[in-house]
Amino acid sequence: MTIPNLTTFGFDSEHQAAYDMAYRYASEELYPLCEKMDNDEWFPEEHYRAMSKEGLLGITVPSEYGGSGLNVLFQCFVCEAISYWNHTLAASFLASDNLCLDNLVRNANDLQKHQYCPKFCEGTYIGALGMTEPGAGSDALGSMATTAAQKGDEYILNGRKLFITNGPVADVLLVYAKTDKEKNKHGISAFIVEKNFEGFSVAQKLDKM
């Protein structure tokens, strides 16, 4: 097995160590899953917990919330290593660990971080980002029709999302919705939506190439 030498491109030994670990794990544990995932449209949810034990989840999450406290560059190397052996699971990893979890780390309040981040880091939660909608083109934010209306201390979301990576398996989604239509794409807020929230449902999986 020949593992790419990152130091050739100016990266340091810590980056190389992270890449090596993810590369070896993916080649041994994730590559054998590819055929079943592609042929049977099967998703190995249990492998998220296994990936957590290897330190592959919550890379950018501060240690106080259960993560590794590293930067997004380490996350990129881990994703690339996984993608070399199982590109489907790499896309899932990116949607959960970066688009959803890293977004929470950057923008959620402290209470929300303590509530959600540890479960992502231990592989109990799989995440997704709910942005794209039916009929949306390149202007996914400007054309967004999903709304969020405040009712007392809560917000009521109304709308549909489509082509959401991890959508059928996500435990928690970060959903974008318009809270101020007059501001167009500048009037969008992000909401944490759990799969068991009242009124939330997931449609059928879409066949893919």
Protein language model regions, located:
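Internal helix-loop-helix
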Residues: 53-124, 165-172
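A short core secondary-structure module
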Residues: 145, 154, 158-203
